[in-house]
Amino acid sequence: MTEHTPPTTPAPEAGSTPTTPAPEAGSTPTAPEPGAASAPPNDAPRRGLSRRALFGLAGAGAAGLAAGAGATAAITAAVSASASATGVTTVYPFSGAHQSGITTPAQDRLHFAAYDVSAGTTRDELIELLQDWSVAAARMTQGQEVADGGAVDGSPLAPPVDTGEALGLPASGLTITFGFGPTLFTAEDGTDRFGIADRRPAELEKLPRFTGDNLQAGLTGGDLCIQACADDPQVAVHAIRNLSRIAFGRASIRWSQLGFGRTSSTSTSQVTPRNLFGFKDGTANVKSEETKTVEEQVWVQDGDSAAWLSGGSYLVVRKIRMIIETWDRAQLQEQERVIGRSKGEGAPLSGGKEFTEPDFDAVGATDQPLIDKHSHVRLAHPTQLKGTKLLRRGYNFVDGNDDLGRLNAGLFFMSYQRSPKQFIDVQRALATDAMNEYIKHVGSAIFAVPPGARKDGWVGETLFA
């Protein structure tokens, strides 16, 4: 729910047109011919799943997902709400200079999961897990089952290696993005479990406390994370479900979240979506076509702290509960004052249309600023933040109701940035945001997102090199 400067006239780059090949993972979708889903995935690493991964697929069952708070109920809800995948044939590559799912055009659905590495897991077993995850992710992003044999073609005397709920469904633009939390490098008790404490980027630290934080322990942190985005919720759920089974005995879900209705656009080809407050959100989000801005604000560069992270990014996750019932009783003019934009057009209250640059000096008939000094737009705008920008990939969420009948809903905020300081500066600037009266932050996490996997390689390979 941050504000960014609208792009000028961005130059098209590889990835903005579906029919143009691109060199990076996630930048260019392809539409496979009918029947192509049965072919081996060209983008998959050549190695297969380890014996331990296959054991996990055979023995984990639903246990891996049950470890996540509310995960079972959430999965059931997502599957039952699955939209028709007819025509959803977009396929993104898994390997490339950067991981897919960052500058990739934001899909409509999300399943996010944070994991804890199991006690007793060794460095070699962690590496093997990342290799197994990469193999499976490369297959699933191409519309394949998680491993040979799949849901129905294996031994009838053994559990299927694939859960099968994505049988017959296309790839649906699935992207799978991996991240490493601070506690992967140094455990909370100070232990260097995997011999990588000295490779932790200096910036990768637990986020400080912010105004409005009401964090729940079960919605924070994680050694690892996986972000699965797709245009069909069942495809995204299938990905997290099977990756969790593969992790059995090595890692388990700490917490997870389902999201719908993206709350930002990451491509100029996408219209601005609305959040659950009913306002257009992320009007001026960083777009993938803004190549110079993406390089400066999103990707970690050579010389930035840890060399192994060059080409990667930092992911900040915040679960923001909206106090829906209070907001719904607010007058329209109050809602617009809080946001700083009109609810219909999304134009700044200083005048113009949605993409008109806000004029923070404009005053009305009473000599009061047309855009309130505590409005979200003013406080989060890059001109107020020395040019700081974030690339957002947030989603709406509804997790039922609380025991008082109030809607448990809001924004699952995700932003990618070159340095965590960018997010910290923005969030601190929002300390006096008028919106704080209507929201509370209940979940929080930060992860280092490594660069993309090389062909036949695996995500995280640079960290353990």
Task: Name the predicted role of every residue range.
Residues M1-L49:
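N-terminal secretory signal peptides
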Residues E3, G48, A53-A74, V79-A465:
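Long, histidine/aromatic-enriched segments associated with O2/redox biology
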